Curated annotation (Swiss-Prot):
<feature type="topological domain" description="Lumenal">
    <location>
        <begin position="63"/>
        <end position="315"/>
    </location>
</feature>
<feature type="binding site">
    <location>
        <position position="284"/>
    </location>
    <ligand>
        <name>Fe cation</name>
    </ligand>
</feature>
<dbReference type="GO" id="GO:0031418">
    <property type="term" value="F:L-ascorbic acid binding"/>
</dbReference>
<keyword id="KW-0408">Iron</keyword>
<feature type="binding site">
    <location>
        <position position="228"/>
    </location>
    <ligand>
        <name>Fe cation</name>
    </ligand>
</feature>
<keyword id="KW-0560">Oxidoreductase</keyword>
<feature type="compositionally biased region" description="Basic and acidic residues">
    <location>
        <begin position="18"/>
        <end position="31"/>
    </location>
</feature>
<keyword id="KW-0472">Membrane</keyword>
<keyword id="KW-0479">Metal-binding</keyword>
<feature type="region of interest" description="Disordered">
    <location>
        <begin position="1"/>
        <end position="31"/>
    </location>
</feature>
<protein>
    <recommendedName>
        <fullName>2-oxoglutarate and iron-dependent oxygenase domain-containing protein 3</fullName>
        <ecNumber>1.14.11.-</ecNumber>
    </recommendedName>
</protein>
<feature type="glycosylation site" description="N-linked (GlcNAc...) asparagine">
    <location>
        <position position="263"/>
    </location>
</feature>
<feature type="binding site">
    <location>
        <position position="226"/>
    </location>
    <ligand>
        <name>Fe cation</name>
    </ligand>
</feature>
<dbReference type="Pfam" id="PF13640">
    <property type="entry name" value="2OG-FeII_Oxy_3"/>
</dbReference>
<keyword id="KW-0847">Vitamin C</keyword>
<dbReference type="InterPro" id="IPR044862">
    <property type="entry name" value="Pro_4_hyd_alph_FE2OG_OXY"/>
</dbReference>
<dbReference type="InterPro" id="IPR039210">
    <property type="entry name" value="OGFOD3"/>
</dbReference>
């Protein structure tokens, strides 16, 4: 019997085709996974870019409507004044010759109040506001009326805390407050060419502390545009003394004079005094504070002695 010759082992029919199908399938599987990873990288990059943009946006407190910065935080201004036409708001009130605005405008100076004085008076605000504070982002302390934000309401701190006030504030605190008020009053009188003796402190004059906490009541919504003469009536000249620094202590929170086509903004700086006539010629608002805490004091003056208030005293 002749020996049988064995050939090479037979490969099952269709096995190479199966391998080709598996290889093709593997490639097909790999492609979606690679595409997925590519898209994930793109999405991650996009999210990262958006986050960085938001952080940068927040850090500088950009406002689309602001066209010009008239006083930057880093500047030390001896005095800058911009004259604007007076509105008709003053015509609806009793006029006082030599005082009621006939020259209108806005000014900024960094040499009237020192940074040391600003730090000292800020400590007065911090002591008073430590007794309460709004549930929302804006708290006020009025040493004249005693109004203090507490939760969603206001209390009279002199009645509420009674004799304990003597342990919180000092005579030196109130003397500093009076000295600063007088310096600001003289600055306004000189800028507008009127006699300081014709100006009377008026209400409300108050400390403000603003942070990024969500508003809880209408009193916390400080960012709406308004006209002081319309809102308060008694105001003829408004001033703000800033007690903290933009972009160091807080972001956002710049002061914006609203003008058609070209808004003007003031960047707060501790010791900076911003002042202006209170009519519609100086429609304004404050940007929302995005982070940190912004301190300031609003000091308002009237030409009407009937609307005047006395300096606060520690009794």
């Amino acid at each position: 019997m002749a020996p049988q010759r064995r050939g090479p082992p037979r490969i099952p029919e269709g096995s190479s085709a199966a391998e080709r199908r598996r290889a093709t399938s593997t490639k097909k599987d790999r492609l979606p996974r690679e595409a997925q990873r590519t898209w994930l990288r793109i999405v991650a990059f996009g999210v990262g870019l958006a986050l960085v943009t938001c952080l940068l946006w927040s850090s500088v407190g950009i406002d689309d409507d602001v066209a010009e910065v008239v006083a930057r935080r880093g500047e030390v201004l001896e005095g800058r004044f911009i004259e604007v036409p007076c509105s008709e708001d003053y015509d609806g009130h009793r006029r006082f010759e030599g005082c009621t605005p006939r020259k209108c405008g806005r000014g900024v100076t960094d040499i009237v109040i020192t940074r040391e004085e600003a730090e000292q008076i800020r400590r007065i605000a911090e002591k008073g506001l430590s007794l309460g504070g709004s549930d929302g982002g804006a708290s006020i302390l009025d040493l004249h009326s005693g109004a203090l934000s507490v939760g969603k309401h206001f209390v009279n701190l002199y009645r509420y805390f009674g004799d304990k006030i003597q342990n919180i504030f000092s005579e030196e605190d109130f003397q500093l407050y009076r000295d600063i008020r007088q310096k600001v009053q003289l600055t306004i009188a000189e800028a507008f060419g009127i006699s300081a003796s014709l100006l009377y402190l008026t209400k409300p004059t108050f400390f403000s502390r603003i942070n990024s906490t969500e508003a809880r009541t209408a009193h916390d919504e400080y960012w709406h545009a308004h006209v002081d003469k319309v809102t308060y009536g008694s105001f003829d000249y408004t001033s703000l003394l800033y007690l903290s620094d933009y972009l160091e202590d807080f972001g956002g929170g710049r002061f914006v004079f609203m003008e058609e086509g070209s808004n003007k903004t003031v960047e707060p700086r501790a010791g900076r005094v911003s002042f202006f006539t209170s009519g519609s010629e100086n429609l304004h608002r404050v940007e929302k504070v995005l982070w940190g805490t912004r301190y300031a004091i609003t000091i308002a003056f009237t030409c009407n002695p009937d609307h005047g208030i006395e300096d606060p005293v520690l009794t």
